[in-house]
Amino acid sequence: MHIYKEQEAEPSTGLMMPEPAPVASPGSGGSGGSGSVGAEKIGSRGKIEIKRIENTTNRQVTFCKRRSGLLKKAYELSVLCDAEVALVVFSSRGRLYEYSNNSVKETIERYKKANSDTSNASTVAEINAQHYQQEAAKLKQQITNLQNSNRTLVGDNITTMNHRELKQLEGRLDKGLGKIRARKNELLCAEIEYMQRRETELQNDNMYLKSKVAESERGLQTVNMMGSASTSEYVQNMIHYDPRNFLQFNIMHQPQYYPEQEDRKAFMSDER
């Protein structure tokens, strides 16, 4: 859809654009010479100086020619490149000329939206950058204050303090020392309580081991006593037996004499 309109300027368009400067090209000078249309050659290389045409007639002729060429270029651009093109031109007399391959109003709304999005994006980025810069400045100031406070607490930055400030610092230090001592005592009490519990546990273990040792000693004594009783009984039994004939006799009685035993011994001696 290609639209070309030529009409008087209306306030309803809502778009005010500066009058485009005419573009001169070699050989396009209207009815007059190059000087009549505001294009003058400079030097030997054929450069053209663009300036306002003072003659009203020549200016109007040049406007009509250039306007037609501009509209033709806009049409070719929209067709060849499938681009959305909207062209709005106001003459020096206020006459409106426009061209659009879709709709001038829709193209203008699209332009406004794109321009607004770009502005908003840049605005958000700028706001974020400012916010981060402010936060960084606050953090730097906090770091500086903490460093000064630490130097003051260790007594390195008190030369410029008056009596009141020194008194306040002393109170803060006393309060801090009180908290430190309380925490230290708390840790010491906890350590002492732990050591006492550990001592009780070790005493219980020691008593248990002592009872085990005593029980083992009693068992060993019982075994030794049982072994000694068995040995004594065995010895007592051996005392009541004659080792020569294993005949039991009383130790209080004298052994009887047997002549046959002497004869047997003598006979055995003679044979040897």
Curated annotation (Swiss-Prot):
Tissue-specificity statement: Expressed in the lodicule, stamen carpel and ovule primordia.
One Gene Ontology cellular component: nucleus
SUPFAM superfamilies: SRF-like
Disruption phenotype: Abnormal flowers with floral-like organs.
Chain spans, region Disordered: 1-41
Pfam families per the UniProt record, alphabetical: K-box, SRF-TF
Its job: Probable transcription factor involved in the development of floral organs. Acts as a C-class protein in association with MADS3. Involved in the control of lodicule number (whorl 2), stamen specification (whorl 3), floral meristem determinacy and regulation of the carpel morphogenesis (whorl 4). Plays a more predominant role in floral meristem determinacy than MADS3.
Official protein name in the record: MADS-box transcription factor 58
Organism: Oryza sativa subsp. japonica
